[in-house]
Amino acid sequence: MDRYHNRSAEILAFAVGLAMVGYVVTKAFSDHLGVDITAGGRLLLALFLALGMIGYAVWNEITDGFIGLRALLPLALSTLWSGMWPAMQYWGTKSLYFPGLPIEDQDLEWWANGYTQWGGWALILFGGYGIAYYTWRAR
C-alpha cells in the first residue's frame, strides 16, 4: 500500500461511526433518565467534562502538577450542575408536556426555574472557591 495514500474516506467512515455510537449512547442514557435526547446529551457531556476535570486534578495531585483538586473541583461540580438544567426543566414541568413544545413557556416547579439554577451554580462555584481559598489560607 502506498504510504501517502489519501485516507479521507476512512477518516470520514470512522467519524460517522463514532457519531452513531455517540448517538446510541446518548439516546440510551436519555431514555434511562426519562428525558429527551437534548437534555440527556447535555447532561452526559457535562458528566464527561466534570469527570475529565476531576481526573486531571487527581492526576496533578499525584504527580505534583500545577492545578490540584482544590482548584478544579468547584469548576467541575458547577459544570455538572449547569449540565443538569435542561433535565431539571424537563422533570419540573407542572402541566402536560408534549415533545416539540417549547419547554421555556411551561409552568415549572420552584427547583427547576432559572433563579434556582443560577443561584445553585453561583453557590457551588463561588462557595467552592471560597472554601478552597479559606483552606489555603489556613495552611
Predicted feature locations:
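Cytosolic juxtamembrane helix and N-cap/initiation of the first transmembrane helix
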Residues: 1-19
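Membrane-interfacial loop-to-transmembrane alpha-helix junctions, especially the N-terminal start
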Residues: 7-13, 66-74
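Transmembrane alpha-helix entry/boundary detector in multi-pass membrane proteins
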Residues: 7-12, 25-49, 114-117
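Hydrophobic core of alpha-helical transmembrane segments in multi-pass integral membrane proteins
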Residues: 14-25, 50-56, 121-133
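Juxtamembrane "helix-exit" motif on the non-cytosolic side of transmembrane helices
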Residues: 23-35, 57-62, 88-92
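Canonical alpha-helical transmembrane segments
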Residues: 46-71
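Hydrophobic alpha-helical membrane-insertion segments
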Residues: 69-91
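Alpha-helical membrane-associated segments of multi-pass integral membrane proteins
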Residues: 97-139
